[in-house]
């Protein structure tokens, strides 16, 4: 009987040793994050005030700004057909309640004019509809041929002031080719 007790005792010791030596089993859980989701910021980009000699140019500038911000994925331009207030330009304070009714968070107002020098002047104001205050504004003067670059700069300013990140629309790509030995 003593022999069986020793065998049982040895067997129990082996079982306890094996049991203690094993690492605990944990369920392996894999979480895969492959994309984030943020709702685009609703932005109203109002028609820029312009005299007839620059109205087409004004529309082109507006299109570039709108496309830059929309294509960033962070902004959702509101259709101008939804606008309640129809004042254009930079000289007036917007009717914030009218812009809130169409769920705009920010508003861009602007003006384009041709100067006596032949250059164009583009001015704009960025309004925070919720806080009811302007958060950026600028007057740009340049030769007319640089209108597209000015539009990208305006989009950069809007992007930077609203998101806090540096804008990237006014960038240039350099290509360098090396030939010879």
Walk through the language-model features, giving the residues of each.
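Short beta-strand->alpha-helix linker/helix-N-cap micro-motif
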Residues: 32-96, 108-111
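Bacterial N-terminal signal peptides
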Residues: 10-22
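N-terminal secretory signal peptides that target proteins for export/translocation
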Residues: 1-7
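Structural signature of eukaryotic scaffold interfaces centered on beta-propeller domains
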Residues: 152-170
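Sec/Tat signal peptide C-region and signal peptidase I cleavage site
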Residues: 23-27
């Amino acid at each position: 009987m003593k022999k069986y007790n020793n065998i049982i005792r040895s067997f129990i010791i082996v079982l306890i040793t094996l049991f203690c030596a094993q690492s605990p089993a944990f369920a392996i859980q894999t979480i895969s994050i492959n994309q984030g989701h943020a709702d685009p910021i609703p932005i109203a980009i109002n028609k820029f005030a312009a005299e007839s000699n620059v109205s087409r140019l004004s529309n082109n500038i507006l299109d570039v700004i709108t496309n830059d911000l929309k294509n960033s994925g962070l902004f959702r331009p509101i259709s101008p057909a939804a606008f309640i207030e129809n004042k254009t330009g930079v000289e007036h304070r917007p009717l914030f309640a009218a812009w809130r009714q169409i769920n705009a968070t920010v508003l861009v107002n602007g003006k384009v004019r041709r100067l006596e020098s032949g250059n164009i002047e583009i001015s704009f104001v960025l309004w925070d509809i919720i806080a009811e205050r302007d958060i950026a504004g600028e007057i740009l003067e340049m030769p007319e041929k640089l209108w597209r670059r000015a539009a990208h700069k305006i989009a950069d300013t809007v992007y930077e002031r609203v998101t806090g990140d540096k804008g990237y629309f006014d960038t240039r790509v350099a290509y360098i080719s090396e030939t010879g030995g």
